[in-house]
Curated annotation (Swiss-Prot):
Keywords (A to Z) from UniProt: Hydrolase
Record GO terms (molecular function): hydrolase activity
Protein name: UPF0173 metal-dependent hydrolase Msp_0516
TM spans (from-to): none
Protein species of origin: Methanosphaera stadtmanae (strain ATCC 43021 / DSM 3091 / JCM 11832 / MCB-3)
Protein origin, superkingdom: Archaea
Length: 234
């Protein structure tokens, strides 16, 4: 299993059996990312919400690779109107990908307009995802969100993610203090911070976040990734 970071909230996850999943593929306009968008392959693209720094290059990558996009009904409808395959789902629902990997959509506290079109369109709710791999290992991508109680009572207590990808940038999402609380509630083995240091206004000291988490939470390790780096497990 491999989790590759492109910067901001963009990740590529390769499952144990080789399924390639992109999440929020903000690539070509991402100042932290040097990967050419035309080199990126995917089987599935997950979009947490409609903002341009998360929807990113989803249409181009899907068109090039034949990937299917998974998102809320509103975003999936928009994608289908562009001639791209999409699966619509909503919060609390689960879809199976090739009978290998399950994707569950979770709540997030944010907005979700499709803001890069000539006229802004409704994007439905902002969301996160819990991805259950072939081995049963679970990865939580929180999307853009503030701290909310279901991180503990639903995502932490019920889904129990092994690895959590959580925003720390503040201003548009939770900052490092609330993100450390989220990490405590989730009780994941591994926490990978995201959505920081991309633009002015979301600059954060990731090492301070890591120290806060590891000082407060026994059994949780923070793994800050630079764009282009990856985290792997057998």
């Amino acid at each position: 299993m491999k989790i590759e970071y492109f910067g901001h909230s963009a990740f590529k996850i390769v499952s144990e059996e080789g399924l390639i999943m992109l999440i929020d593929p903000f690539i070509s306009n991402n100042p932290l990312c040097s990967t050419p968008v035309e080199t990126i392959d995917a089987d599935v693209i997950l979009i947490t919400h409609g903002h341009s720094d998360h929807f990113g290059d989803a249409l181009e990558i899907a068109n090039n690779s034949g990937a299917t996009i998974i998102a809320t009904a509103e975003i999936a409808n928009f994608v289908q109107r562009q001639g791209i395959n999409a699966i619509a789902m909503n919060i609390g629902g689960t879809v199976s990908i090739n009978n290998l990997v399950n994707v569950t959509m979770t709540d997030a506290r944010h907005t979700s307009s499709i803001d890069f079109t000539e006229e802004v369109e409704e994007g439905g709710s902002a969301t996160g995802f819990v991805i259950t791999l072939e081995s049963g290992k679970k990865i939580y991508h929180a999307g853009d969100t503030g701290l909310f109680g279901d991180m503990k009572t639903v995502i932490g207590d019920i889904y129990k993610p092994d690895i959590a990808l959580i925003p720390i940038g503040d201003k548009y999402t939770m900052g490092i203090e609330d993100a450390a609380i989220a990490a405590k509630w989730l009780q994941s083995r591994i926490v990978i911070p995201m959505h920081y240091n991309t633009f002015p206004g979301i600059e954060q000291d990731v090492e301070l976040f890591a120290k806060n988490v590891e000082d407060e939470i026994i059994g949780t390790m923070t793994v800050p990734l630079m764009p282009g780096e990856d985290y792997r497990e057998e």
